[in-house]
């Protein structure tokens, strides 16, 4: 910490601006990191930010994403990064080094140990991109105990109350994001002209130095930021990565040094700065629970230890706006009247159907199907899409983005956008596009305002579609609403999705009471992100006599890694802005998942499900691909109802439970979607499974490939 303070003190005495440089550890090769660190210093870097790679960054542009991916392929993890700092120190690195990254790898390593080991390795502090304020206080105290700095981030959208709080926890400098969007820079784009005003606003609350990041790529841009009153200028790694790419074999350190000299002006005559932003006498604050009140949520943000907002600073204001709009809406009878007025469009209430043949097959409890598959667009997803569209209109958004896996949420979102005349962009993993090609056509058939963008990063599935949608939202906050499809993501998304899906459970309770005069004994739903399941479960949580059963995708079996059984096999962590159960490796990197059903192929789960699991209120079990196919076949052939592959997981487990119960009991299974979308996929898969399932469909009916 003291080394960082000393840099800014020396620069102030020289009437100069500190040069802060960023590079991703392990890029382009593991062995390049130490020479690159030394080259940054030789090129004039006063402080170095060393990026800890993460598999699923949500605020980084394509260049840094690529650097993260390459670094992870080079087996870079937290201990490796610390080893590189040690080696660089031994070879003469004296510049302060800040470790910059996302919280989950540190959480997996162990927060206390991560801080202690960083200090011993020679690091000087941390910049955590997605650490919430309530946790930042404790984290900062731990850092200070090891003489490490915690550097908070402030964005152009940060409110004055939040600036006041963040300024109170800054001990060496504040990292100021000068423009909204993902990381990246361009020599041809001007730095935010409002920068002097932004810096002046922050200085009302602090005397610590301000280092400005985003958009700096050239010496002229560096000088502009310095003249605006910045105490430090951050040259983000995208430009340094491009310099590395331009280098030939063995030339990386020299190219990096040359670029840094060009930007920093090292070796050139000293330059007199233009008068900067006016200095004010800041109010002095001590970080505590009282100062954190400026960043409190107006709706409950956590379910036990799960939930929260683990997001970049640039998203915080948009989430607060959304939270306030949702609270206002759900307290407004006119809003719910408008929602209910659309039930004739979405085909609510959905039927509660007694599956007599399935019940007879099981020989136990009555099996009831909640027919969400009969909704407009073919699944429960329309409930949430309609509710969020009305919210988006309420806050004046004109552009809608969404992620989709099986395509059901994509179709529902594109459909309601067509109805309300809004622009619509759907992100879909390239693998899911392959599995659900007809869904893509159906979305784009809805009109010129709707289109699908295939995502080719990572595993090319739902997880990666969420990443891209998040990045889009960060960049286009003023016009865009991110219509999240499942009960995932940062607060308030899990609450919003639940509030628009809980109609499922409310209807089940009323409908079964009408025909049976009682509550169900068991309710069953499939669980990926968990929207249909939380919608089914929520109204029954206080009813302790009702057993809640969520069915996860067991894939090829949970004894290996090809599954999506997050609650059964995962550990608590942070993914896509929320603390919940996730599937991760020992280093805190998100692992690739597998399910025969695209909609369940996700390595996280809604935080309310995580709480229901840990509290023991709900049980979560797994169903393999094979058993899901058996459930698909069973319902299709016994009832003439073709279920979605996602719902087939719940069908299999529901029948299994029904067999164990007496005939006077009632089990309700949420049939979350219809299987029209999966018929082509089943026809392609069936030859592989035919003998194992003893399911032989005429070869003339199966298209040859």
Swiss-Prot record:
What keywords does the record list, in alphabetical order? Amino-acid biosynthesis, Aromatic amino acid biosynthesis, Lyase, Pyridoxal phosphate, Tryptophan biosynthesis
Note the InterPro entries from the entry: Aldolase_TIM, RibuloseP-bd_barrel, Trp_synth_b_CS, Trp_synth_beta, Trp_synth_beta/beta-like, Trp_synthase_alpha_AS, Trp_synthase_suA, TrpB-like_PALP
Instruction: Tell me which CDD domains the record gives.
Output: Trp-synth_B, Tryptophan_synthase_alpha
Q: What is its EC number?
A: 4.2.1.20
Q: Name one GO molecular function term.
A: tryptophan synthase activity
According to the record, the residues making up region (Disordered) are 266-287
Per its UniProt record, the required cofactor names are:
pyridoxal 5'-phosphate
Give positions of region: Tryptophan synthase alpha chain.
1-293
Q: Which cellular component appears as one GO term in the record?
A: cytoplasm
Q: Which PANTHER family does its entry note?
A: TRYPTOPHAN SYNTHASE, TRYPTOPHAN SYNTHASE-RELATED
Family under the similarity heading: In the N-terminal section; belongs to the TrpA family.
User: Mind telling me what this protein is named?
Assistant: Tryptophan synthase
Protein encoded by which gene: TRP-1
